[in-house]
């Protein structure tokens, strides 16, 4: 049994249900596979960047891109430290997240991509175009989290091995990406779906799952609460449906993700109790969030917006919070211990409010 967000994930370009203009553009790219450039897809979370990547590959290579396996690759640093990275692969592509290696992401770029790029692809018997395009695609998740050294290594790889490899980079923001990489890629923006588009998609899921719906207003409320994040809206719908035995009423409360509720509680603690003991309690909450694999930058972003929504704070306090958030967001990208910087942000905010 899979989550609805996976069960109803489109697997082809024709199955995509929103942003038709972008879908048609991707179809035009798949019509000329030999001329496929390096791609950089950017946009907010939950807008379907990864889904569109896989749909594009399916259009080029066929259904074989969904024959996935997970390998664990080992890398050795200059200090003889062994590191492991999960690599998702099919006969036609690889999917990696080098930022999981922290400041050692350059090693992944230099060794893994170089190894893949130096091997000419010949097993294309199941692809739609036979042997017409002998290259392998590499999807790089969280490209905006790559260090400058890794991006420099990536630039050299793109220049030297463009014949045998195509890079598809996925990121939330383009600002951390260096200019030489952006200039070598086709930039594709994936905008967030509108509330009406999300409501339409949720309505299709409701029909397929045979959920009893009192009124469609509940779907609009879910779409508004998701802030344009289609993934979150599907998870919220599934949680509400299971909690209410597949019967949703107009009075049914919107169930937000637990980690967001925890951050909102953390915000109230920061505003009401500004003390050393309170800071220690906040540290325990941060540890819990990080242990549940909530990215540190997402925690910082949600905490910042939650603090800005507090009505009792004046304009001076809010401007200081924004300034501190930008400072610690940069430090998160430079450091290895996220807990230090998140706790430092909370301490700064507490001092600001006193």
UniProtKB/Swiss-Prot annotation:
Gene Ontology terms: biological process: DNA damage checkpoint signaling; DNA repair; DNA-templated DNA replication; leading strand elongation; mitotic sister chromatid cohesion; sister chromatid cohesion
Annotated signal peptide: none
Gene Ontology CC terms, in alphabetical order: Ctf18 RFC-like complex; DNA replication factor C complex; Elg1 RFC-like complex; nucleus; Rad17 RFC-like complex
Primary location recorded for the protein, binned into one broad class: nucleus
Cross-referenced InterPro entries: AAA+_ATPase, DNA_pol3_clamp-load_cplx_C, DNA_Rep/Repair_Clamp_Loader, P-loop_NTPase
Subcellular location: Nucleus
Keyword vocabulary terms for this entry: ATP-binding, Cell cycle, DNA replication, DNA-binding, Nucleotide-binding, Nucleus
Binding site for ATP: 5, 17, 43-51, 231
MF-aspect GO terms: ATP binding; ATP hydrolysis activity; DNA binding
Other noteworthy facts: Present with 5040 molecules/cell in log phase SD medium.
Family statement: Belongs to the activator 1 small subunits family.
Subunit composition and interactions: Replication factor C (RFC) is a heteropentamer of subunits RFC1, RFC2, RFC3, RFC4 and RFC5 and forms a complex with POL30/PCNA in the presence of ATP. Component of the RAD24-RFC complex which consists of RAD24, RFC2, RFC3, RFC4 and RFC5 and associates with the checkpoint clamp DDC1:MEC3:RAD17 complex. Component of the ELG1-RFC complex which consists of ELG1, RFC2, RFC3, RFC4 and RFC5. Component of the CTF18-RFC complex, which consists of CTF18, CTF8, DCC1, RFC2, RFC3, RFC4 and RFC5. RFC5 interacts with ECO1.
Family annotation (PANTHER family): REPLICATION FACTOR C / DNA POLYMERASE III GAMMA-TAU SUBUNIT (PTHR11669), REPLICATION FACTOR C SUBUNIT 3 (PTHR11669:SF1)
Protein function: Component of ATP-dependent clamp loader (RFC and RFC-like) complexes for DNA clamps, such as the POL30/PCNA homotrimer and the checkpoint clamp DDC1:MEC3:RAD17 complex. During a clamp loading circle, the RFC:clamp complex binds to DNA and the recognition of the double-stranded/single-stranded junction stimulates ATP hydrolysis by RFC. The complex presumably provides bipartite ATP sites in which one subunit supplies a catalytic site for hydrolysis of ATP bound to the neighboring subunit. Dissociation of RFC from the clamp leaves the clamp encircling DNA.
Protein name: Replication factor C subunit 5
Name of the coding gene: RFC5
């Amino acid at each position: 049994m899979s989550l609805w967000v996976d069960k109803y994930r489109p697997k082809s370009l024709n199955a995509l249900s929103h942003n038709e203009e972008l879908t048609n553009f991707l179809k035009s790219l798949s019509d000329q596979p030999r001329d496929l450039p390096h791609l950089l897809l950017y946009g907010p979370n939950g807008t379907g960047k990864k889904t569109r990547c896989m749909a594009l590959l399916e259009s080029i290579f066929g259904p074989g891109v969904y024959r996935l396996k997970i390998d664990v690759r080992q890398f050795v640093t200059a200090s003889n430290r062994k590191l492991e990275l999960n690599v998702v692969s099919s006969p036609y592509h690889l999917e990696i997240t080098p930022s999981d290696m922290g400041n050692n992401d350059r090693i992944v770029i230099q060794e893994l991509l170089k190894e893949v790029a130096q091997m000419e692809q010949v097993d294309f018997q199941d692809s739609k175009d036979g042997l017409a395009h002998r290259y392998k695609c590499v999807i790089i998740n969280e490209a905006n989290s790559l260090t400058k050294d890794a991006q420099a290594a990536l630039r050299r790889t793109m220049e030297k091995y463009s014949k045998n490899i195509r890079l598809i980079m996925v990121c939330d923001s383009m600002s951390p990406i260096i200019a030489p990489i952006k200039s070598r890629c086709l930039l594709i923006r994936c905008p967030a779906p509108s509330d009406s588009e999300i409501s339409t998609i949720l309505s299709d899921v409701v029909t397929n799952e045979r959920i009893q719906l009192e009124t469609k207003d509940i779907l609009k409320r879910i779409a508004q609460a998701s802030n344009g994040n289609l993934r979150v809206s599907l998870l919220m719908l599934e949680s509400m449906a299971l909690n209410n035995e597949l019967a949703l009423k107009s009075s049914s409360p919107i169930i937000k993700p637990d980690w967001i509720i925890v951050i909102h509680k953390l915000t109230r603690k920061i505003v009401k109790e500004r003390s050393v003991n309170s800071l220690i309690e906040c540290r325990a909450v941060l540890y819990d969030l990080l242990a549940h694999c909530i990215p540190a930058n997402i925690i910082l972003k949600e905490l910042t917006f939650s603090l800005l929504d507090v009505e009792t704070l004046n304009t001076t306090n809010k401007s200081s919070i924004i300034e501190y958030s930008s400072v610690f967001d940069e430090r998160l990208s430079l450091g290895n211990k996220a807990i230090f910087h998140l706790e430092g942000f909370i301490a700064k905010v507490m001092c600001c409010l006193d």
